[in-house]
């Protein structure tokens, strides 16, 4: 299950951009896109409603006879607890069911009534087993605090975990192996998607580290970007991650700091 992130901005332009991303993934990354995740107000900046964006794009693709993708690409909306009370969150969960979505991504609010674990439990209570629940996790799941949080999400009923972006194949392998240990220990069959981040300048990478988004781009990766090996650095990371995904039968999830950045899909890559 290969997934990508897409931020809706203007429906007509979005259609063309998304088609280019899907085609680029197929031709340049060797991946068929299985699902497109629509984020909700990333980095606390207002964006098109995730539910509405996912619904509109899904309907447009289903009506586009020349797209070639409508029968295989799933659109996944995101519900974020940030700034919402319980009633508002329940309303959005009901919207997922009403809209006929088969998956939804869930993000707990830092200051909201429901954290990620409680949000998963509430969604499972309302949606039953009809909808697949997706949530995120820190990369270092072998560390006690992150591991405990992940266990709580797994026990609450999450179906797929997407990790924060990974920049080291060694860290990725350690994460996968520990995830399988947790699966066996808990008797839970949730799926894992490793986060891959398409970043194409050292300046952008430094800004991300300064913003403290919950993950850090390592010095070794920054150094490679500084030395001008932007294309080579990304391709090397992608190939390593793709090989690991095949070896362990897991999935990848591709996003970029500048949303909808076609360079990550081989279109005009540096």
Where are these regions (language model features)?
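Extreme N-terminal starter segment of soluble prokaryotic enzymes
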Residues: 1-3
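Active-site pocket-lining/capping segments in soluble small-molecule metabolic enzymes
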Residues: 6-24, 28, 105-141, 184-247, ...
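Active-site-adjacent beta->alpha loops and helix N-cap segments on the catalytic face
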Residues: 13-14, 44-57, 84-91, 109-126, ...
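Catalytic domains of carbohydrate-active enzymes, especially glycoside hydrolases
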Residues: 22-39, 153-158
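Metabolite-binding pocket within alpha/beta catalytic cores that recognizes anionic/polar moieties
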Residues: 35-38, 44-89
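Catalytic beta/alpha-barrel core
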Residues: 35-47, 80, 102-111, 136, ...
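Conserved, mostly hydrophobic/aromatic
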Residues: 36, 96, 153, 157, ...
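Active-site glycine-rich loop that binds ribose-phosphate moieties when present
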Residues: 142-156
């Amino acid at each position: 299950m290969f997934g990508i992130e897409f931020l809706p901005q203007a429906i007509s332009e979005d259609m063309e951009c998304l088609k280019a991303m899907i085609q680029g993934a197929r031709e340049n990354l060797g991946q068929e896109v299985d699902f497109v995740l629509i984020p909700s107000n990333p980095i606390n900046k207002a964006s098109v409603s995730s539910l509405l964006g996912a619904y509109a794009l899904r309907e447009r693709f289903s009506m586009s006879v020349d797209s070639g993708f409508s029968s295989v690409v799933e659109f996944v909306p995101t519900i974020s607890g940030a700034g919402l009370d319980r009633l508002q969150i329940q309303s959005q969960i009901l919207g997922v069911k009403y809209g006929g979505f088969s998956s939804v991504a869930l993000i707990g609010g830092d200051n909201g009534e429901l954290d990620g674990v409680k949000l998963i439990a509430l969604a499972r209570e309302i949606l039953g087993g009809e909808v697949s629940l997706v949530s995120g996790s820190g990369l270092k799941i072998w560390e006690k605090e992150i591991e405990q949080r992940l266990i709580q999400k797994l026990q609450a009923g999450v179906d797929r975990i997407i990790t924060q972006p990974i920049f080291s194949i060694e860290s990725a392998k350690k994460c996968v192996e520990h995830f399988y240990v947790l699966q066996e220990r808990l008797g839970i069959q949730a799926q894992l998607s490793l986060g891959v981040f398409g970043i194409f300048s050292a300046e952008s990478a430094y800004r991300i580290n300064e913003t403290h988004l919950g993950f850090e781009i390592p010095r070794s990766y920054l150094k490679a970007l500084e030395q001008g090996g932007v294309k080579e650095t990304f391709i090397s990371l992608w190939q390593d991650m793709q090989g690991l995904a095949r070896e362990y039968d897991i999935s990848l999830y591709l996003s970029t700091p500048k949303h909808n950045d076609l360079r990550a899909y081989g279109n005009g890559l540096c």
